[in-house]
């Protein structure tokens, strides 16, 4: 099985479009399969417009939003934007959706309730497939050419979100990390949701997501990602502790109690509370050889697409080393 490798958050910490374009072009040159941008509308350049511009300078890579929400953008606006990006990129767009995270809470707003969120996912998917939807004013659909439907993914970590994705989405961006036991648990929830909607598990693509750091010294790599995974881990455990082994539960609860979402990213938690379990679960960090061993285990478990967020501190070094020393082992 040939694995797909995508990069996430190319625009993290980047203040100008030229640098993002350089990163996008280099990702394609190195053989990555996709580039994904998160959306934080005041702290980062607009993701939809940025990806549309990246479509003009790339030929092959998937262009994904991972993720946006329905708090700031109405589902019909998202449908139109996704369909537009897919036309501009000639079928390479993926729209990743979540209920709302940092940018939403930071403005004192609330995440979209799951029932409303699922209705929105279904509406967006319905519209990008070229179908009209019924509104008080009558039937309304996308009025421009849709050569191919954009893929609609749901970012999910908790059991309800995973089942929702199985019922309603084309794919799942799996934020539960790279623990094989958790991966099997998540697939079970997705399978259950798919069954509720009369779908097959194979109908839903799964992208496993986490942090990346490749260094000559594996311990250094794990030190670098320790703070950066804190936000990811905190987001995950807000939904459930169900996936935490009993022997790790006390440490995870201490981490959650010590996390302050209102502080800057690097200062939200004492690094000593980000233990080895969290680093291992939410990152692929180490020497090239250690990364190869880890990914081989994931592939054997059925993982076929990884979305990796390179640590900002060593972004270029990690992206280059991973592409030249790790990826070739899985692209034969």
Question: What do the PLM-derived regions correspond to, one by one?
Answer:
Residues 4-18, 68-75, 146-157, 212-215, ...:
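Active-site mouth loops of central-metabolism enzymes
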Residues 15-27, 78-81, 156-167, 225, ...:
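Short, acidic/polar
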Residues 1-65:
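N-terminal beta1-alpha1-beta2 module of alpha/beta enzyme domains
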Residues 31, 54, 85, 124, ...:
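Conserved, mostly hydrophobic/aromatic
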